[in-house]
Design a protein with these regions (language model features):
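Hydrophobic/aromatic-enriched cytosolic interaction surfaces used to assemble or bind macromolecules
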Residues: 1-323
């Protein structure tokens, strides 16, 4: 009997590596291994792996202690070096769209395009003011230097990166399975970026990414640095919530002015121990229902570990297995 292919989906943050090894048997996904490994300060900064030796030690320990078997990885990226922009282009044949998007991408991306790897997903169709058909796309641009660093360091560790994908898109794919077709928004915060996206089915109607501003950086960083034991100061959590409240309220207001169909539900995603408190306080000031998504219920039924913090890892692993 041929060996069943598996792949490890992983996400790298400033403070830790999270990973899930996934396979597909008889049409169903199965978790083979799952775990995380803390990273020492300075190993990963601003999305870049700064200390390859210590990173290699950490990921080797994770693979060993978690009984991971595969050497193939799909990596989810979610930091300030990944830019997402919503754009519209005149509708053309599918085989011409890619060239059009890549030729005009610089108009939407505020960093020299030669420094970025650019991809896109089709986000629906509409018409402009002149009733001309338009194709909406979500542009995804990641710094080439960061991506090449990941590939080179994994290769030096005798690991192969088979795919690199956006964590935010991985979240969308997971939520599409549980949202019952409603128009939903995602609020996703990490230690260096705040993401918003509005989705219904396969149509994306807004995307916004904000680098955590200097006034909030220290508080947000402390909340995430101590996310597992909750040892952050209450004032840092309150400052983080205040920042989230301000940006989320303004984003919802802007979206409502630009769109006729309202957001029906908001999903809050963050890898902190304070998610429930954050959602509770946001809900006091935001009229749209907010909840923490319960990702992959069929997989959760076979796991004693909550899967929320591993959702991006699972999402990129599934995408890679599906090819």
């Amino acid at each position: 009997m041929a060996k069943v292919k598996s792949i490890i989906g992983c996400e790298i943050s400033t403070n830790e590596i999270r990973a899930v090894e996934l396979t597909k048997e008889n049409g169903f996904y199965k978790i083979l291994a799952m775990g995380y490994m803390p990273l020492e300060e300075g190993v990963v900064e601003e999305g870049f792996i700064r200390d390859a030796d210590r990173f290699n030690t950490a990921i080797t320990q994770l693979i060993s202690s978690g009984n991971f078997q595969s050497t193939d990885f799909a990596v989810a990226v979610n930091n300030e070096n990944v830019l997402m922009r919503f754009a519209s282009f005149p509708k053309v044949d599918a085989d011409k769209l890619r060239n059009m998007v890549l030729l005009q991408a610089q108009e939407f991306i505020p960093i020299p395009i030669q420094e970025m790897e650019v991809d896109y997903v089709v986000a629906g169709e509409t018409k402009d003011d002149d009733d001309t058909p338009q194709t909406n796309v979500m542009l995804i641009a990641a710094r080439r230097q960061m991506l090449e660093g990941y590939i080179n360091i994994f290769t030096a560790s005798k690991l192969q990166i088979q795919d690199i994908d956006s964590s935010l898109l991985a979240y969308c794919r997971g939520i599409n399975e549980i949202c019952n077709g409603v128009k939903y928004g995602i609020v996703n915060i990490t230690d260096d970026v705040l993401n918003y996206i509005v989705v219904q089915g396969n149509e994306i109607s807004m995307v916004r990414s904000i680098t955590i501003p200097e006034r909030s950086q220290k508080s947000v960083a402390k909340v995430f640095a101590n996310s597992r034991d909750g040892s952050f100061e209450q004032e840092d959590l309150e400052a983080t919530i205040s920042f989230l409240m301000q940006e989320t309220s303004s984003t919802i207001s802007y979206y409502a002015m630009q769109n006729n169909i309202p957001i029906e539900k908001i999903y809050f995603i963050a890898n902190t121990s304070a998610n429930e408190k954050i959602v509770s306080e946001l809900q006091e000031n935001i009229y749209i229902p907010i909840e923490i998504p319960q990702f992959y219920p069929s997989l959760q039924s076979t796991s004693v570990t909550p899967l929320g913090e591993y959702a991006s890892c699972i999402g990129v692993a599934i995408s890679s297995l599906e090819g």
